[in-house]
């Protein structure tokens, strides 16, 4: 990472280097109009339109780089932040990579509650979070806990079947891998998702930092909302505005038709079908929904 030491005029943004987190992160960058080209063999890419350097790192390493102020911003999971035990800001939930860090035991086994695992052997790649969880369960400091926690970097779900562990603590998204391994969850240690994380001692330009955060907030809002427009009879406007109150307030415009107005409002994407149906039932006409490619809120 010696090259980073020579990028003093750039804001350093740590990005997961592979997998679904990488793909989703790149989508966020594109939506934020941070343009770049990444060479196949390099883990650093310079933005072509902003004074930003993208540093591609394993997701588990990003909290350390941001926490130590080596990078100004990063994208990684809350699980990685908590496991790393670093002090960073988490300004934006990016709403992908959503999963649970759970205590899992064999389906056909004797354990049905985490309390039964006190004094047993637990395997996880999240050793710090696992120790903290079981120390709290035992009501003692970590140095005095009797539960044994072992680190395994991958294929954690095989540990019980191989006799290495009585239980595991691992991430669960859909649960398919867990069920395929003959495991079931009996407790949740942490709910997690990908977040934008920010150094508490950024070295990059503070105004640029604010701009990037604002752009990413705009991308997230555009993903959550759509724009809904319709024509409304003035005598039914109060009821229709209850259906589409907007983020702050709807926009109401006069049209060249006596007794009618045009209404435009932001509505949640997930509810757009029901909202359009309700508008129609309450007298609205010419109801249209438009995508929001980006915005500032």
Swiss-Prot record:
Domain of life: Eukaryota
SUPFAM superfamilies: GlnB-like (SSF54913), Periplasmic binding protein-like II (SSF53850)
Protein's recorded name: ATP phosphoribosyltransferase
Purpose: Catalyzes the condensation of ATP and 5-phosphoribose 1-diphosphate to form N'-(5'-phosphoribosyl)-ATP (PR-ATP). Has a crucial role in the pathway because the rate of histidine biosynthesis seems to be controlled primarily by regulation of the enzymatic activity.
Cited Gene3D superfamilies: 3.30.70.120, Periplasmic binding protein-like II
Presence of the UniProt keyword Glycoprotein in the record: no
UniProt-listed InterPro entries: ATP-PRT_HisG_long, ATP_PRibTrfase_cat, ATP_PRibTrfase_CS, ATP_PRibTrfase_HisG, HisG_C, N-reg_PII-like_a/b, N-reg_PII/ATP_PRibTrfase_C
Pathway(s) the chain acts in: Amino-acid biosynthesis; L-histidine biosynthesis; L-histidine from 5-phospho-alpha-D-ribose 1-diphosphate: step 1/9
Listed EC numbers: 2.4.2.17
């Amino acid at each position: 990472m010696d090259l980073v030491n020579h990028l003093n005029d750039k804001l350093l943004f740590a990005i997961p280097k592979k997998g679904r987190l990488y793909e989703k992160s790149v989508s966020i960058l594109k939506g934020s109009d941070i343009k770049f080209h990444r060479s196949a063999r390099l883990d650093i890419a310079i933005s072509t339109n902003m004074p930003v350097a993208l540093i591609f790192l394993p997701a588990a390493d990003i909290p350390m780089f941001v926490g130590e102020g080596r990078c100004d911003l990063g994208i990684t999971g809350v699980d990685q932040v908590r496991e790393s035990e670093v002090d960073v800001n988490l300004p934006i939930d990016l709403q992908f990579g959503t999963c649970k860090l759970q205590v899992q035991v064999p389906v056909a086994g004797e354990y049905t509650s985490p309390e039964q695992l006190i004094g047993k052997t637990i395997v996880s790649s999240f050793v710090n979070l696992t120790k903290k969880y079981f120390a709290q369960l035992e009501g003692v400091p970590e140095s005095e806990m009797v539960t044994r926690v072992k680190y395994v970097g991958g294929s954690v779900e095989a540990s019980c079947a191989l006799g290495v562990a009585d239980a595991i603590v691992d991430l669960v998204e859909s649960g398919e891998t867990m069920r395929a391994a003959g495991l079931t969850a009996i407790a949740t240690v942490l709910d997690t998702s990908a977040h934008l994380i920010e150094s508490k001692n950024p070295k990059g330009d503070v105004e640029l930092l604010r701009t990037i955060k604002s752009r990413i907030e705009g991308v997230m809002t555009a993903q959550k909302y759509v724009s809904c427009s319709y024509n409304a009879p003035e005598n039914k406007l109060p009821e229709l505005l209850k259906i589409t109150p907007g983020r702050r307030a709807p926009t109401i415009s006069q049209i060249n038709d006596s007794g009618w107005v045009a209404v435009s409002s932001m509505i949640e994407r997930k509810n757009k079908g029901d909202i359009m149906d309700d508008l129609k039932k309450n007298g609205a006409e010419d109801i249209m929904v438009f995508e929001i490619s980006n915005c500032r809120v």
